[in-house]
Amino acid sequence: MKSVQFCFLFCCWRATCCRSCELTNITITVEKEECSFCISINTTWCAGYCYTRDLVYRDPARPNIQKTCTFKELVYETVRVPGCAHRADSLHTYPVATACHCGKCDSGSTDCTVRGLGPSYCSFSDIRE
């Protein structure tokens, strides 16, 4: 009986204390030199923790796959950047995650590095949301 209670308490603790891989709101900054304008866009992306391990030794029978919190489903949305010069491309397309999971990072479609995408601020002085 005590082991059942312990398992129940452990599962409750894990569910409340450890955030799993889930959708989260983020703000990205978009600017174009030909527009001399900057906007902030609210979107969703995946964040959280995934169970992973790093083996001390390499075992050819068990490949070492690091799992990361990444998108399972993705859509693209387009926004028009205001203030663009005539004939300048004022459209910017950005990804929006609609579902997340813990899985192997696909380097063909995702930046799997530790570094971020760079600064999340505008280099122009006029910022509009």
Curated annotation (Swiss-Prot):
Localisation per UniProt entry: Secreted
Keywords: Disulfide bond, Glycoprotein, Hormone, Secreted, Signal
Signal as UniProt keyword: yes
PROSITE patterns: GLYCO_HORMONE_BETA_1, GLYCO_HORMONE_BETA_2
Cysteines paired by S-S bonds: 21-69, 35-84, 38-122, 46-100, 50-102, 105-112
Gene3D superfamilies: Cystine-knot cytokines
UniProt-recorded Gene Ontology molecular function terms: follicle-stimulating hormone activity
Signal peptide stretch: 1-18
UniProt-annotated glycosylation sites, renumbered to this chain: 25, 42
A biological process term (GO) from this entry: follicle-stimulating hormone signaling pathway
Matches recorded under Pfam families: Cys_knot
Entry function: Together with the alpha chain CGA constitutes follitropin, the follicle-stimulating hormone, and provides its biological specificity to the hormone heterodimer. Binds FSHR, a G protein-coupled receptor, on target cells to activate downstream signaling pathways. Follitropin is involved in follicle development and spermatogenesis in reproductive organs.
Family: Belongs to the glycoprotein hormones subunit beta family.
Protein name as it appears in the record: Follitropin subunit beta
Lineage start: Eukaryota, Metazoa, Chordata, Craniata, Vertebrata
